[in-house]
Amino acid sequence: MNFNKIFVFVALILAISLGNTEAGWLRKLGKKIERIGQHTRDASIQVLGIAQQAANVAATARG
């Protein structure tokens, strides 16, 4: 019976430790995905600006 209490205690400590480790790993992955999304958004905004300028130049050249 004493062994069961020790086993449950050790299992609980391991579960808490591994749970915190997983949360950190998952948070890092989320931050990387968020950063990729931000870079994609910024790049698309720049491309739209360049395309709009090119359209303005083409319209000006046509007259």
Swiss-Prot record:
Keywords carried by this UniProt record: Amidation, Antibiotic, Antimicrobial, Immunity, Innate immunity, Secreted, Signal
One term under GO cellular component: extracellular region
Gene symbol here is CecB
Q: What is this protein called?
A: Cecropin-B
Cellular localisation: Secreted
- State its role: Cecropins have lytic and antibacterial activity against several Gram-positive and Gram-negative bacteria.
UniProt GO BP: antibacterial humoral response; defense response to Gram-negative bacterium; defense response to Gram-positive bacterium; defense response to insect; defense response to virus; innate immune response; response to Gram-negative bacterium
Q: What is its main location?
A: secreted
Signal peptide positions on this chain: 1-22
- Cite the InterPro entries for this sequence: Cecropin, Cecropin_insect
